[in-house]
Regions:
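Hydrophobic beta-sheet segments that form the core/acyl-binding groove
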Residues: 61-63, 67-98
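Active-site helix/loop of acyl-thioester processing domains in fatty-acid/polyketide metabolism
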Residues: 38-61
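Surface-exposed loop/turn and secondary-structure junction residues enriched for glycine/proline
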Residues: 31-32, 36, 42, 71, ...
Length: 115
């Protein structure tokens, strides 16, 4: 199930940088956490997978994730930039002066018809 246009929307794209905003009224924030909502880490990783799949124009799934670090919580009212470099993904503020999360990932194409 895609999170795009439900939990987040893409608002700009510039090469390997994708800017997005979250939907603060999404039901996930009622439970994570009710009085102090933050974007779940699993969702941040899934969004990266969706963005990369769209960029490659083929379905993929991450097979390994390493060096996953959350430096600062991301709240639903924040805009963030996903920066994709080789196998490293960073989630930062729009002017790229603060990195909120980062990880390395390897992936596999999940479409058996794609070589």
């Amino acid at each position: 199930m895609s999170l795009r246009n439900k939990l987040y929307e893409q608002i700009a794209s510039d090469g390997n940088r994708i800017r997005l905003r979250f939907n603060p009224s999404h039901p996930i924030f009622a439970g994570h956490f009710p009085s102090n909502p933050i974007v779940p880490g699993a969702c941040l990783v899934q969004i990266a997978e969706e963005i990369l799949s769209e960029r490659l124009n083929r379905p993929i799934r991450f097979t390994t994730i390493s060096n996953l670090k959350f430096h600062q919580p991301i709240t639903p009212d924040m805009e963030v930039v996903y920066q994709l470099n080789e196998n490293k993904i960073e989630i930062a503020n729009p002017d790229l002066t603060a990195v909120y999360a980062q990880f390395k990932a390897t992936y596999l194409c999940t479409d058996p018809d794609v070589q």
